[in-house]
């Protein structure tokens, strides 16, 4: 697999960061827009470690929030790594607990209490790093896992995200005892658009009439509470689908952002019933 220039640069930037910052508590971010191929970059990080330092057996844990991302990351890892490097899962949703694999792709909900079963780990890669609690005093799943693993082995950590700041505009590297201490590499949306790796969004010419009232939705850690927001959005989806069909029926491809998977599936179903 031939990497794009920015993908190779991101990997090189990470290794340069780790070389400069020797303390395991120095944890960088790779800022990578949606569509940049985070799973490819993740796989290349692991591939280079096994190629350069096989004598250290650089076993790696890739933390993801969902089984879908677990399967996506594992697929890229299996495509890039030699057959003798075993890629396994720890995911209740997939029915697999392969704690002794060379590279473990794990859903955080399934592994956060299982650090003691992993043995010697050299690297932890956190996908969707903005999901990590912003408070050092908060014993969330990610911090619990890292703390427990740190009691049995020494390892380096990196986070990957498309959004290096939270809904309250506070950067992931700022605030009360942030987990992440700096940005090792930053790929911009403009760079991907200019190189035509991403297509620009085309907004509708017609006025959008639907306005979702989220004034009663609660706020947590500077962002909307997803469950409450999803419930509110659900009541608007039929109206949204009808309006979208009216103003964008001539477009070949659409993209819709919803607060939850349930919202997305419901909207897709409504669009299908409208002939989209």
Model-inferred region functions:
Residues 1-31:
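Conserved pre-motif I regulatory segment
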Residues 13-19, 36-55:
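Walker A/P-loop NTP-binding motif
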Residues 23-45, 255-257:
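Walker A/P-loop
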Residues 39-41, 56-79, 260-262:
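Conserved Walker A/P-loop ATP-binding site and its immediately adjacent core
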Residues 78-116:
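Inter-Walker segment of RecA-like/P-loop motor cores
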Residues 103-128, 132-145:
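Conserved RecA-like ASCE ATPase "motif II neighborhood" in helicase/translocase motors
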Residues 131-203:
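Post-DEXD/H (motif II) to motif III coupling segment of the RecA-like Helicase ATP-binding lobe
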Residues 181-258:
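Conserved interdomain linker/interface between the two RecA-like ATPase lobes of SF2 helicase motors
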């Amino acid at each position: 697999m031939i990497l794009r220039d920015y993908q190779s640069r991101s990997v090189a930037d990470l290794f340069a960061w780790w070389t400069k910052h020797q303390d395991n508590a120095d944890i960088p971010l790779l800022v990578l827009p949606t569509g940049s191929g985070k799973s490819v970059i993740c796989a290349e990080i692991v591939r280079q470690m096994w190629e350069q330092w096989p004598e250290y057996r650089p076993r790696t844990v890739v933390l993801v929030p969902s089984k879908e991302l677990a399967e996506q990351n594992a697929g890229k890892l299996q495509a890039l790594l030699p057959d003798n490097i075993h890629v396994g899962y720890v995911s209740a949703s997939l029915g697999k607990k392969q704690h002794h694999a060379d590279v473990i792709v794990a859903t955080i909900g399934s592994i956060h209490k299982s650090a003691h079963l992993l043995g010697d780990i050299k690297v932890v890669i956190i996908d969707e790093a903005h999901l990590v609690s912003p408070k050092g005093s908060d014993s969330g799943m990610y911090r619990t896992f890292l703390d427990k693993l740190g009691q049995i082995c020494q390892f380096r950590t990196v986070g990957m995200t498309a959004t290096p700041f939270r809904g309250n505009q506070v950067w992931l590297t700022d605030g009360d005892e942030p987990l992440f201490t700096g940005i090792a590499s930053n790929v911009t949306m403009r760079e991907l658009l200019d190189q035509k790796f991403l297509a620009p969004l085309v907004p509708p010419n017609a006025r959008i009439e639907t306005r979702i009232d989220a004034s009663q939705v609660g706020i947590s850690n500077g962002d909307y509470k997803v469950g409450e927001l999803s419930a509110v959005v659900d009541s608007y989806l039929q109206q949204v689908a009808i309006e979208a069909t009216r103003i964008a029926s001539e477009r070949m491809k659409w993209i819709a952002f919803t607060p939850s998977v349930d919202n997305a599936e419901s909207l897709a179903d409504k669009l299908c019933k409208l002939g989209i």
